[in-house]
């Protein structure tokens, strides 16, 4: 029987399945950070259980860390406690930890792929909703809750029901300046923020194949923002070339053998999906969100929509509420909207390719008066590579702040945040109310679009920035 990639990955990891019961899956990799793990380790301790597979468990500090100093106290008392608990728990249970002083420290969904912890064909979980990022490698990766974190630590397994399947095909070739972030925002604009609910999404088509691994990670990272359980891209030569030689990747003949298996990880001809969505890449323009969920998104050349234009009463009410929170008026061109802050970073867009794209725009320009612009590399290795390429100097000369690795302004859990009423062009993944700080107004954009907003002081079409 012909199978989708998701069905192959799921079936290959079923440990036990009884009639009328939820299947039990084996978990190949468990990624851990400081926010969702303390109670899970406490549960192990209370029941005198060890971590079953410490060699398949990797921890880092990211959500709470300051990006201005490596002082564990800088982000407040709760952050300090969570980071100290992670140190204690990893030491006690034998889990490898990339702490603030480790050269590999960084955002968990940046660290995993760059260290070769993430490999095609794996099941990967983390107590973090954007674990879908790792699906870019043809791995079944999804976020879990703290009780499930404890279950995986104790058993290396997880009960998981089968999801529906969705195929999202992006045909043709994207125009110059159009990035994976624009593509995925356009997809969510079409499906809505709940369009993928109950599904695992496989992204395919010529425009997807043309993306780098960094671009594919951006794509899968935001699968959750359309309500999907996970996102997938079938592995290919781009994947294999990225993985080869990384710290935890197979070596020598083992790598060659692995590639032969990884080549089978694709949807069979004749396999059927529950839902199919198609977009044409050449029709996608630079995207900017205007509301308070990622599905409220338009082209940078469009005007703010009028809630009255929505036929669905729920969408209309949502648009009215979003515009009131965002302080926007219908009919105003996006390019007339001024910004206060710019954030380039997050598990969506903090990799070297993202920083290069932003630096290309920033080079020879200056951050607009009154705008604060942050560039936060996703990990120690990304920061080191960017500095070796001189990107830090480009940003600093242009007036951007060059920071230490961390989740930073993606979420208000550290000392990088918006003040009430401040408007931010952000390369992160969520524009919910208060996401970047109480009363903060978030617009999601690509790294190049964020840099363009920084130097012009408002949203600008990257295609017109020469």
Curated annotation (Swiss-Prot):
Cofactor: how bound: Binds 1 [4Fe-4S] cluster per subunit.
SUPFAM superfamilies with a match to the protein in the record: Aconitase iron-sulfur domain (SSF53732)
Cofactors: [4Fe-4S] cluster
Keywords for this protein: 4Fe-4S, Amino-acid biosynthesis, Branched-chain amino acid biosynthesis, Iron, Iron-sulfur, Leucine biosynthesis, Lyase, Metal-binding
Iron-sulfur among keywords: yes
Pfam families from the UniProt entry: Aconitase
Pathway listed: Amino-acid biosynthesis; L-leucine biosynthesis; L-leucine from 3-methyl-2-oxobutanoate: step 2/4
A Gene Ontology biological process term: L-leucine biosynthetic process
EC class (word): lyase
Highest taxon in the source lineage: Bacteria
InterPro entries: 3-IsopropMal_deHydase_lsu, Acnase/IPM_dHydase_lsu_aba_1/3, Acoase/IPM_deHydtase_lsu_aba, Aconitase_4Fe-4S_BS, Aconitase_4Fe-4S_dom, IPM_dehydratase_rel_enz, IPMI_cat
Reactions listed under catalytic activity: (2R,3S)-3-isopropylmalate = (2S)-2-isopropylmalate
Residues involved in [4Fe-4S] cluster binding: 347, 407, 410
The UniProt record lists the keyword Iron-sulfur: yes
E.C. number(s) listed in UniProt: 4.2.1.33
GO MF annotation terms: 3-isopropylmalate dehydratase activity; 4 iron, 4 sulfur cluster binding; metal ion binding
Its job: Catalyzes the isomerization between 2-isopropylmalate and 3-isopropylmalate, via the formation of 2-isopropylmaleate.
NCBIfam families recorded: leuC (TIGR00170), PRK05478.1 (NF004016), PRK12466.1 (NF009116)
Assembly, per entry: Heterodimer of LeuC and LeuD.
Annotated family: Belongs to the aconitase/IPM isomerase family. LeuC type 1 subfamily.
Name of this protein: 3-isopropylmalate dehydratase large subunit
